[in-house]
Design a protein with these regions (language model features):
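Condensing-enzyme catalytic core mediating Claisen C-C bond formation in acyl metabolism
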Residues: 1-62, 173-248, 252, 350, ...
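Conserved beta-ketoacyl condensing-enzyme motif
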Residues: 6, 62-133, 263-283
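Buried hydrophobic positions in well-ordered alpha/beta secondary-structure cores of metabolic enzymes
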Residues: 6-8, 47, 76, 90, ...
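Acidic-glycine-rich active-site phosphate/pyrophosphate-binding loop
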Residues: 40-46, 107-123, 160-165, 224, ...
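Claisen-condensing/thiolase-fold acyl-transfer catalytic domains that form or cleave C-C bonds
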Residues: 66-70, 97-106, 110, 131-151, ...
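Short beta-strand segments
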Residues: 93, 133, 158-164, 189, ...
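Flexible, glycine-rich active-site loops centered on histidine and acidic residues
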Residues: 154-184
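Acyl-CoA/ACP chain-elongation machinery
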Residues: 162-163, 210-218, 277-280, 312, ...
Length: 368
């Protein structure tokens, strides 16, 4: 029986650290285009209390989305020990392409995945580059697509990358700009033969897309400051609606996914959620535990034992948060968190669309 196994992971975090002082001189506006009367100190304090974000990472000038994706991809390939010429697909999850340094417009042609293949110097003409534009849920959806290609014997090794340079598409006059950051993550997924009774790798997944009334909860638009004309591509987010949607939909979807896999929450050793907002992630996990009547585990210290967090130091890098967090744990850089052979983890994300997805992955007891 063919199973989809993660054979390598990698990530890239920019070295430019942006702390709260960076935003102290910003002029913040509300959704009506009026300057907010509160002091920046008040605005930043409230923001940090909700999100827990203390700092975030921005790319250095001249570094493109495809550049950092290629760095993470190379690390994942090296970790996998698989020859780059044996990669059958490159699935690149992102939302804004490469941002032109002068016009600040998104560049999608050629595709990010094709640029990654070029930067990795992969000569194999049968290696197909494929872009996944799916909001912050793109990397998990890319893993789902890769799993289907592997299980159907259309591929043997697939590189799934996720990358974003959100610092280049945020409105400096929008308070929400403080949420976003830059980064990249990657994984190599390979087809491996196992016995029928061995259940490893991707053992279950689910995706839900609410693309009608919720379509514009997260979108693009002009600056909140009517006089700011630097870029027409700015992330626009209805935080309250997204929060309400997440708490209504995500816990139930994850519970149903576990049920369909004949698993209980106590079978899961780690839960890796998209690092969107600390308050929201805690609330999602609490709701999920409440569905199992695990009310004794709702304290924050208990939540953090099963759900590692990086948003405090790295911010929200969209598609890159889940694979980055996974790689950090696997490389022993998130103590006391660890993933041991045989462990089962739950990964989940939500993003523009609105889309939500989840995946259950079990690590093999030993390497093939």
């Amino acid at each position: 029986m063919i199973l989809s196994i993660i054979t390598g992971t990698g990530h890239y975090l920019p070295n430019k650290i942006i702390k709260r002082d960076h935003f102290m001189k910003h002029k913040f506006y509300d959704n009506r285009g009026f300057k907010i009367k509160k002091s920046n100190e008040e605005i930043i304090n409230k923001f940090q209390k909700i999100t827990e974000i203390e700092e975030r990472r921005y790319v250095n000038e001249g570094l493109l989305n495809s550049d950092i994706a290629a760095i993470a991809a190379k690390k994942a390939l090296n970790n996998s020990k698989i020859c780059k010429e044996k990669i059958d697909y490159i699935i690149s999850a992102h939302n804004y392409g490469d941002i032109h340094p002068i016009s600040y417009q998104s560049d999608f042609v050629p595709s990010i995945s094709a640029k990654i293949k070029n930067k990795l110097r992969i000569k194999n003409k049968k290696c197909r580059p494929y872009d996944m534009i799916f909001g912050c849920t793109g990397w998990i959806e890319g893993m789902i697509l890769a799993n289907q290609l592997l299980r159907s014997k259309h591929a043997k090794n697939i590189l799934i990358t996720s990358s974003e340079t959100l610092s280049q598409v945020t409105d400096p006059h929008d308070r929400n700009t403080m949420i976003f950051s830059d980064g990249a993550g990657a994984a190599v997924l390979s087809a491996m033969e196992y016995l029928e009774n061995e259940k490893y790798g991707i053992i279950h997944y689910d995706t839900q897309c609410d693309n009608n009334e919720k379509l514009y909860y997260l979108t693009n638009g002009p600056s909140l400051n009517p006089n700011y004309k630097k870029s027409l591509v700015n992330i626009r987010m209805n935080g309250r609606r997204i929060y309400e949607y997440a708490l209504t939909e995500v816990p139930t979807m994850l519970k149903n996914m576990l049920d369909h896999a004949n698993l209980h929450i106590h079978d899961i050793q780690k839960i890796i959620l998209h690092q969107a907002n600390a308050k929201m992630d805690y609330a999602i996990l609490k709701k999920l535990l409440e569905l199992y009547n695990y009310t004794s585990l709702l304290k924050k210290d208990c939540l953090l034992k099963i759900m590692p967090m990086t948003i405090q130091k790295f911010g929200n890098s969209s598609v890159a948060t889940v694979p980055t967090l996974l790689d950090l744990i696997l490389k022993g850089k998130m103590p006391p968190h660890e993933i041991k052979p045989g462990d089962t983890i739950l990964m989940a994300s939500l993003g523009a669309g609105m889309n939500i997805n989840g995946m259950i992955y079990r690590f093999p007891n030993k390497k093939k």
